[in-house]
Structure formats: C-alpha cells, structure tokens
Amino acid sequence: GGELDYVRSSIGIDRIYDLEKEVADKTINQLLNFNDDEWAEKGKKYIKQIQNINTNHKSFFTDKMPHNFMMCGLIHKMLPQAKIVFCYRDAMNNCFSLYKNTFGTSGHGYSYDQTKLSKHYNLHVKLMKHWKNVLGDKIFLLKNESLIDDQKGVTAKLLKHCGLEWEDQCLEFYKTQRDVRTISIRQVRNPINKKSLGLWKNYADSLSEMQKSLKEFS
C-alpha cells in the first residue's frame, strides 16, 4: 500500500480540495446521483488498480493517502467491507509536525501558514466527527499518544478491528526491509518513542496563532 490516489480516480473526480464553489457543487451533485450498482463498479475499479501493484498477492493492503479523510463516506459506499482507521494526534503535536516540514506541491500548501493550517485542521476535526457519527464502528479511532503509551494493547485492538490475527512482528515494524516512501521515513525505521511529544513547546512563542485556534478531536 502507501499514499495512493486510487479512491479519487476510481470515483472519477478531479480532486477534492481547493475547489471553486461552482465546481464543488457540480461534484457533489455528481456523487449524489450515483446508484448502488455504480458505486459497486467504482469499488471494483479501485480493487483492479490495487491488483496492478499488488505483485506479492497480499490479501490486505493499506491506503494512507492523507486526503482520504475527506472521502470516508464515499469509501464506505464503494468498498463497504473496507476497514477505516482514523489516526490522529494531539492538535499541537500534529500541526507543528506539518508546519515544520516541506511538502512541495503535494497539496499541503495550507501547512506553511498558521492561520490556514489551523482552519484546515479544525475543518478536518469537524468532518471526522461527522463521519464517526454516520459510520460508527466502521471507523476505528487510533490516537498516536495512546499508541505510544500502550503499543501492544492498542495494536491488539486495531488488529481485531481489521479482522487480523496477532503477530509479534507488529511490535517490530521498524525492522521491515520493504521500500517506504513517506516524509516520516526516519520514524518508520525506529521503534515507537516519545521524542516528538510536546516538541512544539520549544517554539511556543512563535506558534501563538495555532495555540489560540486549534481544536482537539474528541
């Protein structure tokens, strides 16, 4: 798996963020007009794209495209058996991590401005609360800080949600030899730790806008 753009392309929409109102309204109307058979076909199209890259013929894969959070309802419509996992962090820990990194032209331009970043994060929190209310147990909530405090316990609950058996290797993910393409590659290659918790406090005087505006997911 990885950060795949297959949800959007399978549904057939150009993009899901930074849309002009007219385009957004047209996209929403388009989505509302799909019937169950059409959603099922889009699900098959998604699986077909996955099969093209699943050279090891694995039974399970992950799609961690950041913007997928906007489409949880659509994902459920076209892939009703999909397991949705919402990974989130303390708001300041999360947004400081975004603010200090460079994403190039990957669709995260909001992350370079504290006001825009706070607005984006808060809208993301509001939307995820909506999806959780609508989809209920279809969405598994995984808070980073909880995973750090109890890696084994939280991992066991995650595996149960996904219908997977326990494997001790789950606690040693950093030993994997597979290719990893993510801005957090250094974290992936190391055990879970608390190094990034509260790191933003070292720069608190320069982060007043975020401290004032951010809302927690709860």
Locate predicted features:
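Phosphate-binding active sites in nucleotide-utilizing proteins
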Residues: 1-79, 87-88
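Short, structured coil segments at secondary-structure junctions
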Residues: 79-80, 135
